[in-house]
Design a protein with these regions (language model features):
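An N-terminally biased module of ancient metal coordination in phosphate/nucleic-acid-related enzymes
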Residues: 1-82, 178, 183-184, 190-192, ...
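Mid-to-C-terminal alpha-helical segments outside catalytic/metal-binding sites
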Residues: 278-302
């Protein structure tokens, strides 16, 4: 069984491909058997994803990636950092979840407006033309789901302001950032579990992402943080990830097994480059999800 439970789409967040392209590639050349679309703070693409999974004969888990704020008194002076969690197998029509994600979506638009205002101040210093309402509309039109800085970065490349999206972040978007709408780990857990799903700590040692590596590079200390401060709120850990090395994967698998947690894995593919199905996730990961929750699964194994 080939499994990828961490994929982003253009329909819902910052992926480069739409759902049709993802499923055509996944069912065709990649031969993926179990998949989940995990867009940032958005479940708008889930209905179509379920339909496409059934059409292509791929087993599917409803998914979402939630950005949460987390703090620990022993690190960063107790100041909060951003972490990511993955929600799986929730009811896409749960009214509380839908309402909260709509609030997050609306906040993201207001955040983008404020980021553009900050960018305009930097542009003025450099003699560059300011972003206008038309630019905001164009950025917003580029995505159906959750707006964010990657969409601004892509637009800046298209406008010729920077050569690459990474340059957009390095020169402008880091210093012009505006905080995301705070969502605590406890709130995220209540949202996903309240909708019948499971909450998984995403890529806990990702050196380039929103992970526990922002608190400490020590795997031993990370595991202690999970043990002491997260066990009440998570159902599992994403052990296999495209930016996890073998040591990280092994440490988190052992911890999860000892603590009775689920394990998950995926590429975190944004299709740039295309990594779908390239993380070797063992069959038992899929089996633990499929075993008791068939109501959320469409399609069949090959």
């Amino acid at each position: 069984m080939k499994i990828d439970l961490h994929i982003h789409s253009r329909n819902g967040s910052d992926g480069h491909w739409g759902l049709e392209e993802i499923f055509a590639e996944g069912a065709g050349r990649r031969q993926i058997d179990l998949i989940s679309i995990t867009d940032h703070d958005s479940i708008r693409a889930q209905g179509l994803a379920l339909e496409l999974a059934q059409s292509y004969g791929i087993a599917y888990l409803t998914g979402v990636e939630l950005n949460v704020t987390f703090s620990h008194p022993a690190y960063k002076g107790g100041n909060p950092v951003s972490l990511d969690c993955l929600g799986y197998q929730y009811d896409i029509d749960n009214p509380v979840l839908v309402e909260k994600l709509e609030a997050l979506r609306n906040y993201r638009k207001r955040r983008v407006v404020r980021i553009l205002e900050n960018l305009n101040r930097e542009f003025a210093k450099e003699g560059l033309p300011a972003f206008t309402v038309a630019d905001l509309d164009a950025i917003e039109a580029s995505v159906d789901g959750a707006l964010g800085r990657p969409h601004i970065a892509k637009y800046m490349v298209n406008k010729g302001i920077v050569a690459t999206q990474q340059e957009a972040f390095d020169r402008y978007l880091v210093q012009c950032d505006v905080p995301k709408m705070p969502l605590s780990l406890k709130e995220a857990s209540e949202l996903i579990r309240g909708a019948g799903g499971k909450l998984i700590l995403a890529h806990p040692n990702d050196p380039n992402g929103t992970s526990l590596a922002n608190l400490t590079p020590s795997l031993k200390e990370q595991l202690q943080i999970v043990h002491d401060a997260m066990m009440d709120y998570i159902d599992g850990i994403e052990c296999w990830h495209s930016r996890h090395d073998h040591k990280t994967t092994g440490a988190y698998i052992t911890f999860a097994q000892n603590m009775g947690l689920m394990v998950s894995g995926g590429s975190d593919c944004h299709q740039h480059p295309v990594l779908m199905g390239e993380v070797d996730v063992p069959d038992y990961v899929g089996e633990q999800f499929l075993k008791g929750l068939q109501s959320h699964v469409q399609g069949a194994t090959r």
